């Protein structure tokens, strides 16, 4: 098996894997660059000497300062939570593409408002207000982009294409982690020093806004809304095939069958998917989607993203430049491992297996770091020039090892699974629910991490280590492997028990349905579909 080998659900023309589908995914993923940058830059910006001086952080007690910092960080997640819910409405009425335009505009307005903050008259309030709006923008985008990409993607590369969304997150995070190291080492601690990191937010948002005018609407959304002629044109453009090509004919028939089934079972309309929540199978998938983000945030990732100076100080790293440098290296490691996950792991190794490995390895690393802090108490050394002990160096090694386990597993895989596990009629609502869960747990972590470090110290690491172990049990018993399964077959996947064998059994069913003998018997049906397609266009 080669590095980029693909496991196809049916014979697929090479033309399907073309630059158009990758380019559309990349443009939509400017949204994740926004999210990654905002998640990464804020923690180190709050530690910039120019920022702490302008807003007089020295006048606060430790508890009051922790509360202020957590509020600045967490209002963004609160806005994102509601942005996810708003996205369900915009997705239904406006479509995927126009929703991306709308949420990029909201983000741009929020980022611009933040630039009005100062240490005198306006104070820090514009930053808080702007981060609420920016949060609404990224919350909506975090809902929309995985859906949009999954609906464009051929099944064999769906994980890889949704993974571009995760790659964009890491590119934004990499810039966010390093930018404050750059301004801190090259600029005087003036107002301009901290304004630059806030202003950079406008770049990915502007690129998403402009790019969204070029990318097409999701063909699945167009079919669901009765715009068949436009949908056919978009689908043929994305697949780089003619309307009469057998692959296009089959894909249209799959989409039509899926829409017909859910029109019959759930019904069309804005409120109909809410009524489908009465069904146990739908409730179960919503629960699974939300729990994936509970376990993801339970790994400790967002405590590190938002409060990296605090995290590294607890290990024994002192000095602003050193803390920023260590944070920047953390961003580089995440970026490299995300590329490995994107190109190989997610579509070849599968979703379940990499979640197992990531949780087990990450938990061991957290146990070691917590034990080191309990025994050595490195945080008690307040000297700026304090050197790391051999135990501290080992703790740093295990921190980066934890990053190596977490990044190619829990970082992006929950987004991939949630983008593909819901049916057409509940996909927007399901993704909204999953993304809202992500931002809810994100909010909890960002709001209480400073207080947790004050009260629990080393216990914070034991807490995250325990949650990672529990996630293994949950995934093993409750989550089926979704790799290579067509979106139209997801319902069947979640019906098969036990979940450990569901993917294997369903792929065998799909291959049986499409074996040569059955293909011959269905050839007349395909000819009829070709004729119908020709008439449609």
Swiss-Prot record:
Disruption phenotype: Impairs growth on quinic acid as a sole carbon source and leads to very low inducible levels of qa-2 and qa-3 enzyme activities.
Induction of its expression: Expression is induced in the presence of quinic acid. The quinic acid (qa) gene cluster is subject to two levels of gene control: a primary system which responds to the presence of quinic acid via the qa-1S repressor protein that blocks the qa-1F activator, and a secondary system which represses transcription of qa genes in the presence of a preferred carbon source such as glucose.
Cellular compartment(s): Membrane
Top-level taxon of the source organism: Eukaryota
Entry GO CC: membrane
Keywords: Glycoprotein, Membrane, Quinate metabolism, Transmembrane, Transmembrane helix, Transport
rRNA-binding among keywords: no
Residue ranges, compositional bias (Basic and acidic residues): 514-531
A matching Pfam family: Sugar_tr
GO BP term, example: quinate metabolic process
Protein's membrane topology: Multi-pass membrane protein
Alphabetized SUPFAM superfamilies for the sequence: MFS general substrate transporter (SSF103473)
InterPro entries for the chain: MFS_dom, MFS_sugar_transport-like, MFS_Sugar_Transporters, MFS_trans_sf, Sugar/inositol_transpt, Sugar_transporter_CS
GO molecular function per UniProt: carbohydrate:proton symporter activity
Residues in the Extracellular compartment per record: 48-74, 120-131, 182-195, 307-327, 374-389, 457-458
Glycosylated residues in this chain: 184
Chain positions covered by the region annotation Disordered: 514-537
Main location: membrane
Functional description taken from the UniProt entry: MFS-type transporter; part of the qa gene cluster that mediates the catabolism of quinic acid (QA) and as such, allows the use of QA as a sole carbon source. Involved in the upatke of QA. The qa cluster encodes 3 inducible enymes (qa-2, qa-3 and qa-4) catalyzing the first three reactions in the catabolism of quinic acid to protocatechuic acid (also known as 3,4-Dihydroxybenzoic acid).
Name used for this protein in its record: MFS-type transporter qa-x
Source organism of this protein record: Neurospora crassa (strain ATCC 24698 / 74-OR23-1A / CBS 708.71 / DSM 1257 / FGSC 987)
